[in-house]
Amino acid sequence: MKGILGKKVGMSQLFTTEGIAIPVSIIEVPENIVTKIITKEKNSYDAIQLAAFDKKQSRFLKPEIGHFAKANTKPKRFIKEFRDFQGYKLGQTVDVSIFSPGEFVDVTGTSKGKGFAGTIKRYNQAIGPRSHGGGGGSKPIRQTGSLGDISGNKVVKGMTMPGRLGHEKVTKQSLEIIKVDKENNLLVLKGSVPGPKKSFLVIKSAIKKPNPKNPVSLFVPNSDKEVKNE
């Protein structure tokens, strides 16, 4: 399974040669450094640890300085393990060229935090009756309904109640790669990805792989030629 670390730049749109607009997410994918090799002999599973985005020197910690020195690099801000991703040695780099247009990937990030919210917005619960005893104002009709059986004498775990909305780990599956820009270290995906701008993302090969597609032919202004995404 291939994987790489990136940062969300934002969203835009591209046009095909047929004039169809495609909403796309642009992800910055710098060179990832292999900072650790994990093997079955020592850890009972195979994986590599990738790191990206330099830390400020004022935030270096002594243990991580030694850890990253083994890979001949400086401490990084974003570190993740990728299982069953082999063929690399300690200190090698992994770049965006491991992917190609037409492939599908899963993108994991932290969704936007929206603060405190009630159950209607947070869990899509129904609003109560506005008449026949529903009460006046907005509060009574927007309250949570039943919290469980009366014989339980307690509120069981997992009940849908008001609380913080968003800021959760979210994975969007099977996003199509529209373009790979190795010169600028950018990956262009069809659709949206979790999180705000500048948030860190984990990009992996899709688990649920749709039928393969031919790369989209993009329209280029002031040109009579169509561009295959290479």
Swiss-Prot record:
Please name the Gene3D superfamilies in this protein's record.
3.30.160.810, Translation factors
UniProt keywords, alphabetically: Ribonucleoprotein, Ribosomal protein, RNA-binding, rRNA-binding
Q: Which Pfam families is this protein grouped with?
A: Ribosomal_L3
Q: Name one GO molecular function term.
A: structural constituent of ribosome
Q: Name one GO biological process term.
A: translation
| Single GO cellular component term | cytosolic large ribosomal subunit
Q: Where is this region: Disordered?
A: 125-149, 210-230
Query: Does this entry carry the keyword Kinase?
Result: no
- Out of the domains of life, which is the source? Bacteria
Q: What is the documented function of this protein?
A: One of the primary rRNA binding proteins, it binds directly near the 3'-end of the 23S rRNA, where it nucleates assembly of the 50S subunit.
Subunit organization: Part of the 50S ribosomal subunit. Forms a cluster with proteins L14 and L19.
Family listed: Belongs to the universal ribosomal protein uL3 family.
Question: This protein is called what?
Answer: Large ribosomal subunit protein uL3
